[in-house]
Amino acid sequence: MTNIIQEIEQEQLKENIPHFRPGDTVEVKVWVIEGSKKRLQSFEGIVISIKNRSLNSSFTVRKVSNGEGIERVFQTHSYSIDSIFVKRKGKVRKAKLYYLRTRTGKSARIKERIE
């Protein structure tokens, strides 16, 4: 029984997902349906958490727009995600960056990781 479920999950996993970690700045292109129109919407921000659960994997992206913090949770293997681009790699020492919610200005900056 579990083999059948695992086979179905393996078929639905996306293969073209780039490797990114918390602290990285990513741009996610998402398909948005408005009425009968379908268009791509871009969301760029810092990855503050990643949950790895095979098909149910997700990641949270945070950006600040007009002084308001906006967080969006994306399902990693969702069909609504068109592409993910890693713009900048961040150097952090934690897996969850929830402390960025309370910080503003220079204290919310993340150093760049050079590899």
UniProtKB/Swiss-Prot annotation:
Coiled-coil residue spans: none
Keyword Lipid metabolism: no
InterPro entries the UniProt entry points to: Ribosomal_bL19, Ribosomal_bL19_CS, Ribosomal_bL19_sf, Translation_prot_SH3-like_sf
Keywords on record: Ribonucleoprotein, Ribosomal protein
Entries under Pfam families matching the protein: Ribosomal_L19
Entry keyword Transmembrane helix: no
Record GO terms (molecular function): structural constituent of ribosome
GO CC annotation: cytosolic large ribosomal subunit
Signal peptide (from-to): none
GO biological process: translation
HAMAP family: Ribosomal_bL19
Family under the similarity heading: Belongs to the bacterial ribosomal protein bL19 family.
Known function: This protein is located at the 30S-50S ribosomal subunit interface and may play a role in the structure and function of the aminoacyl-tRNA binding site.
Entries under NCBIfam families matching the protein: rplS_bact
Protein name: Large ribosomal subunit protein bL19
Organism, as annotated: Buchnera aphidicola subsp. Schizaphis graminum (strain Sg)
Classification of source organism: Bacteria, Pseudomonadati, Pseudomonadota, Gammaproteobacteria, Enterobacterales
